[in-house]
Amino acid sequence: MLVLGIESSCDETGLALYDTERGLLAHALHSQIAMHREYGGVVPELASRDHIRRALPLLEEVMERAGTAAGDIDAIAYTQGPGLAGALLVGASVANALAMAWDKPTIGIHHLEGHLLSPLLVDEPPPFPFVALLVSGGHTQLMRVTDVGVYETLGETLDDAAGEAFDKTAKLLGLGYPGGPEVSRMAEFGTPGAVVLPRPMLHSGDLDFSFSGLKTAVLTHAKKLGGANICEQAKADLARGFVDAAVEVLAAKSLAALKKTGLNRLVVAGGVGANRQLREALSAAAKKRNFYVHYPDLSLCTDNGAMIALAGALRLQRWPDQSGKDYAFTVKPRWDLTSLAR
């Protein structure tokens, strides 16, 4: 089965072709970072317009690279939610227009399910069941993943997502956009232990997270150091303190989730899953505590069409009736992942 995947939930336009026998054939991605940088964040209207401009050229690119024609495609999967409403509508419209023209069925995919399943795109995919740490700019959750469509929330953030805390810390320190990579880069030059920040909910006894207090601690510390006049080394030390605190909490909660479930396999997904410090901490813990940890390829940590094509293919293998040719669609800017059970 050959599935075309289309991702357009926020500020990346991604298209990909995934075959259930041959794997990922091709994927192409356009990031809008440069366009949104001058605004310091994503502007929804600009994001939607750019998805319109990029979708068809990316389609031509992936089909050429995969050596496929429209007649070879069995179904089209697209991100139905959650995300920015206008951006989602662009991807859904493109998917259903192509499907109507080519007489193909479509299937709407949950964006976070795509992230959860993205580590299955590696050469040696993790078997079910596993614990997943889903950590991005909009979400921070620990999930028990029993199979495709069978998800249980073990813990989640009570306020800011981890990626949001990274971005806000970058703004507080006067760093560039996107903030997450900039904070991580600056932290590389920080002195370990020079700044020690609180570890919110580290000992709460549950698997939930909170990052708003950590963000406030960064603000308070930055003001003490001179606010806008803070020197570069002080910025680096503060960035290091922030990253160390965030990573320690994420790693500790992940280990607690493995202990609670009795599972020995952890999957890390989402944009923050590309963070080097987080990967190193979890990999070191895996060696010490004898469990397995899996990551998607760095190129697939960000939003992408490959994960949507994969999720669509896996769902259609299990439940062929989930696709259709009526081409009447809705998008779901807010959508609970656990509602997908089946």
From Swiss-Prot:
Gene Ontology cellular-component terms listed: cytoplasm
Gene Ontology terms, MF aspect: iron ion binding; N(6)-L-threonylcarbamoyladenine synthase activity
Cofactor: Fe(2+)
Catalyses which reaction(s): L-threonylcarbamoyladenylate + adenosine(37) in tRNA = N(6)-L-threonylcarbamoyladenosine(37) in tRNA + AMP + H(+)
InterPro entries: ATPase_NBD (IPR043129), Gcp-like_dom (IPR000905), KAE1/TsaD (IPR017861), TsaD (IPR022450)
Statement: the UniProt record of this protein carries the keyword Repeat: no
Record flagged with keyword rRNA-binding: no
Binding site for Fe cation: 111, 115, 303
EC nos: 2.3.1.234
Principal subcellular localisation of the protein: cytoplasm
Role noted for this protein: Required for the formation of a threonylcarbamoyl group on adenosine at position 37 (t(6)A37) in tRNAs that read codons beginning with adenine. Is involved in the transfer of the threonylcarbamoyl moiety of threonylcarbamoyl-AMP (TC-AMP) to the N6 group of A37, together with TsaE and TsaB. TsaD likely plays a direct catalytic role in this reaction.
Protein's UniProt name: tRNA N6-adenosine threonylcarbamoyltransferase
Gene transcribed to yield this protein: tsaD
